[in-house]
Amino acid sequence: MAARLCCQLDPARDVLCLRPVGAESCGRPVSGSLGGLSSPSPSAVPADHGAHLSLRGLPVCAFSSAGPCALRFTSARRMETTVNAHQILPKVLHKRTLGLSAMSTTDLEAYFKDCLFKDWEELGEEIRLKVFVLGGCRHKLVCVPAPCNFFTSA
């Protein structure tokens, strides 16, 4: 079954949160095991971050009831386009994680909805659609060196 996520704006923290489609309206993670991501150490992921809810290719904090630690998701295929040469999205997102002024939340929300989520809807399973993880979050990806399908749960 394909994993589907929705994008929700959290105005209180000025970040975009990824939520599994089918989660409760209050943004709580879906129950049940969706696959595993081994953690570098048991203490690397707090208990309230729902390590058992890890989806292949996503850091466990993506499923926290508080949302992911930082705005860090994008499409690798879009990273290769000339559009991103002007926006320099990774640098923009990194500035936001440091609390510096950069692209507005509205612009970022539009970028994600247009580029990433539209790809998921139109293309379905796309092995080149990846997760881009910025530094600063301790919930790192621990796999995905080669193309893999993080749309499908384990």
Swiss-Prot record:
A fraction may be phosphorylated in insect cells and HepG2 cells, a human hepatoblastoma cell line. Phosphorylated in vitro by host protein kinase C or mitogen-activated protein kinase. N-acetylated in insect cells. Coiled coil: none annotated. It is found in: Host cytoplasm; Host nucleus; Host mitochondrion. Residues 68-117 are annotated as: Mitochondrial targeting sequence. The keyword DNA repair does not apply. May form homodimer. May interact with host CEBPA, CFLAR, CREB1, DDB1, E4F1, HBXIP, HSPD1/HSP60, NFKBIA, POLR2E and SMAD4. Interacts with host SMC5-SMC6 complex and induces its degradation. Interacts with host TRPC4AP; leading to prevent ubiquitination of TRPC4AP. Interacts with host PLSCR1; this interaction promotes ubiquitination and degradation of HBx and impairs HBx-mediated cell proliferation. This is Protein X. It comes from Hepatitis B virus genotype E (isolate Cote d'Ivoire/ABI-212/2003) (HBV-E).
